[in-house]
């Protein structure tokens, strides 16, 4: 279908006057004015209701063509993909992480690493004290990110110690790819 084709080139949303989707211009304006006043740096705003863009705008110097780094928004997409895969029976919150990467398991995994589950990755309480040293462009490393994560020390019992852990999100994405045969992005596009 045309919608599927558009998604492969970038998401294209339908537009609609906000009134037709049941939103109030007074409330929209109040929100934008409050955001402008209270939030230190605003780049852009888009409100989608019932699958239609009903309001959008940009603060100078940004515009529609300005790319934005999403940072932690990736965690929301990844956890959505995990939830969908769970609903399809492809994995469980209580699955051990090592189950998905038998070729990457360290020679002598710690008991804490063996105990790490999908739910621990989602909650960012993997038992790590520090993040695994995963870098986008590290010419010195020949190991995969998965292998690097699994080789990183897990001094705490999973589920007992919180650490904001971006590599845990990568591991969730790798699990989704493992159980679906698709990248997280392609899997989400096929479902949403």
Mark where each language-model region is:
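N-terminal pre-domain segments of enzymes
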Residues: 1-22
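A short, well-structured edge-of-sheet supersecondary motif
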Residues: 33-62
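Extracellular/periplasmic catalytic domains that process cell-envelope and extracellular macromolecules
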Residues: 38-40, 61-62, 92, 111-116, ...
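Active-site SXXK
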Residues: 51, 68-94, 121, 172-176
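Aromatic- and histidine-enriched alpha-helix N-cap/loop-to-helix transition segments
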Residues: 71-77, 113-116, 162-170
């Amino acid at each position: 279908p045309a919608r599927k084709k558009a998604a492969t080139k970038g998401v294209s949303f339908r537009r609609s006057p906000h009134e037709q989707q049941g939103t109030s211009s007074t409330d929209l304006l109040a929100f934008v004015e409050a955001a402008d006043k209270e939030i230190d740096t605003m780049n852009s705003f888009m409100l989608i209701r019932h699958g239609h863009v009903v309001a959008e705008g940009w603060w100078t110097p940004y515009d529609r063509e300005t790319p934005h780094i999403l940072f932690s928004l990736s965690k929301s997409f990844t956890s959505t993909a995990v939830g969908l895969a769970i609903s399809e029976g492809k994995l469980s919150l209580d699955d051990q992480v090592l189950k998905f990467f038998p070729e990457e398991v360290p020679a002598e995994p710690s008991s804490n690493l063996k105990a790490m589950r999908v739910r621990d990755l989602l909650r960012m309480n993997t038992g790590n004290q520090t993040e695994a040293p995963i870098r986008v462009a590290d010419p010195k490393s020949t190991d995969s990110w998965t292998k690097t994560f699994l080789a990183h020390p897990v001094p705490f019992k999973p589920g007992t110690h919180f650490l904001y852990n971006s590599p845990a999100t990568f591991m969730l994405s790798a699990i989704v790819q493992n159980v679906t045969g698709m990248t997280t992005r392609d899997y989400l596009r096929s479902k949403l």
